[in-house]
């Protein structure tokens, strides 16, 4: 294990991207991932699942969240809101919706309606009504063909994307993260996330806690009773729980949507730097999550602080004064 002495800010990898609520990720124009034709990946996955094995399902929806409405209990329980895992092997094995050399389901249905049309009494008297109805049914066949073409096109997009993800295509990794937006829950609270990687087996994250924004002392003091010292200690404990819960949330969400085996998270916050004696943005936690160990944890019930003991981790937290600066783990 190699350390970055002093916990220098920024990621030590070649490919990075800042995740923002206001804008989409700036993907490398030379490698644009898979063209989804303006459609959302979530919608394509949900549509594909309707006609295939239920075991391949995914729930990518993120509940609406506003920091002023969320309780302090929820803030320290971020790890309980992880996305379901995307089974890329299962997605890649999804069968085509129909044989491309044959008529699709929509056209078959439209043709059946056209061929089974039997003019009634009025149609036989007023021939123009019969002709009008037949034109409508023929138009429905054309529309059905377009629907089938779009249906097969969606299948091809998902098939191509899943194959490239399984092959470790970094452009597609970033595209999936940009489309599914696994960190929005943290971003809505006021934290920030930057991701990066050098290879297809790992992802590195700088998690900017912004604790004073997420848990303002003014709000905390109103909701927590006790003397000043007790409230101060409880406040620092709350920040510790939020940070540990959030890094579990970050690592688990990344591993749930892209097939990396390691996620390295560096948590940064504006706290007193003991080396400089003044408040500064410093690394307060650095941890290496491996997939095998993380998968063994019951993410819904685990104590996030205790969970860190299972991983290579640098963290210093004092009961009366909170987090202290630590060295970053840069080789893992």
Question: Can you name each region flagged by the protein language model?
Answer:
Residues 2-19, 23-28, 33-332:
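Long, charge-dense low-complexity segments
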């Amino acid at each position: 294990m190699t350390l970055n002495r002093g916990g220098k800010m920024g990621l030590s990898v070649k490919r990075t991207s800042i995740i923002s609520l206001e804008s989409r990720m700036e993907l490398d124009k030379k490698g644009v991932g898979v063209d989804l034709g303006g459609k959302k990946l979530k919608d394509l996955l949900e549509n594909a699942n309707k006609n295939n094995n239920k075991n391949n399902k995914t729930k990518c929806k993120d509940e609406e969240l506003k920091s002023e409405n969320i309780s302090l209990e929820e803030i320290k329980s971020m790890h309980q809101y992880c996305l379901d895992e995307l089974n890329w092997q299962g997605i890649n094995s999804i069968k085509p919706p129909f044989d491309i050399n044959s008529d699709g389901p929509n056209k078959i249905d439209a043709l059946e309606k056209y061929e089974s049309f039997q003019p009634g009494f009025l149609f036989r008297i007023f021939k123009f009504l019969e002709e009008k109805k037949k034109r409508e049914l023929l138009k429905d066949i054309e529309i059905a063909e377009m629907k089938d073409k779009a249906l097969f096109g969606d299948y091809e997009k998902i098939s191509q994307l899943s194959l490239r993800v399984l092959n470790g295509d970094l452009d597609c990794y970033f595209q999936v993260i940009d489309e599914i937006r696994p960190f929005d829950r943290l971003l809505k609270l006021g934290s920030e996330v930057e991701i990066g990687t050098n290879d297809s087996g790992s992802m590195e994250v700088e998690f900017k806690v912004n604790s004073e924004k997420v848990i303002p002392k003014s709000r905390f003091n109103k909701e927590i009773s006790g003397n000043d010292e007790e409230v101060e200690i409880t406040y620092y404990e709350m920040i510790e729980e939020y940070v540990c819960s959030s890094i579990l949330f970050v690592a688990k969400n990344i591993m749930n949507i892209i097939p990396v085996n390691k996620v390295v998270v560096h948590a940064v916050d504006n706290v007193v730097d003991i080396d400089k004696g003044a408040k500064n943005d410093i690394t307060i936690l650095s941890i290496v999550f491996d997939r095998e160990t993380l998968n063994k944890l019951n993410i819904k019930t685990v104590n996030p602080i205790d969970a860190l003991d299972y991983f290579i981790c640098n963290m210093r937290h004092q009961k009366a004064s909170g987090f202290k600066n630590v060295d970053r783990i840069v080789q893992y």
